[in-house]
Every structure is written in C-alpha cells, then in structure tokens.
C-alpha cells in the first residue's frame, strides 16, 4: 500500500510540473519593463523601461527582446536568456552557455 501511495504521489507531482510547463509562456517586454526580479540564485535583475539593465552578479548594461529571448548585454556578459512566465506569476530563466537555470518573482 505504501508503495502505491508513493507512486501515486510521484505521478501527481510529475503531472503538475508538466501542466505548469505546458502553460508557461515566453516572457513579454511588458512583463519586465520597469520591474525587478529576485532570483532564487540570490541575484536581482532590474529591467529599466528605457532598456537599461542591472544585475547584482552580472553588472550594468542593456536588455532587449529578441526572437530567441531576452538579450542581456553588460560590462561583463553578453547572452540571450530564455525566460518563461509561469501561470503562478513566477519566472523561469535558462542560459545554457552560463549554466544558469533560475526561478524568480517580482521583488517586493
């Protein structure tokens, strides 16, 4: 019985993850412009309405939307982040070349 409950719990959790991922949408400029996101890796990204960008780890620079995602250019880095907005309002960012896989939400 215990084994069935564990299997059922695992299946339910996996289905929620898959449904959440399926409902995620690429981030839009309006989601970021003028906002700051606090990431689970301890960094804070600020996306200025005029395209300015700052991050506590990667420095200051610019951001813009591209077909591939969010282009970030700072004094230290230049990369495109694949950013999704999840149904619960959190964000998920992946930057394979930098080894970044972070979840965040609007800073309060």
Residue ranges of predicted features:
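Lipid interaction determinants
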Residues: 6, 20-108
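Positively charged n-region of N-terminal signal peptides that target proteins for export
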Residues: 1-5
């Amino acid at each position: 019985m215990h084994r069935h409950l564990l299997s059922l719990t695992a299946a339910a959790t996996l289905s929620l993850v898959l449904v959440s991922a399926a409902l995620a949408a690429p981030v839009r400029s309006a989601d970021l412009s003028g906002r700051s996101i606090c990431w689970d890796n301890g960094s804070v990204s600020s996306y200025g309405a005029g395209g300015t960008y700052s991050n506590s780890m990667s420095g200051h620079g610019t951001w813009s939307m591209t077909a591939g995602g969010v282009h970030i250019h700072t004094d230290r880095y230049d990369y495109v982040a694949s950013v999704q907005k999840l149904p619960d309002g959190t964000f998920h960012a992946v930057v394979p070349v930098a080894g970044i896989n972070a979840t965040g939400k609007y800073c309060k």
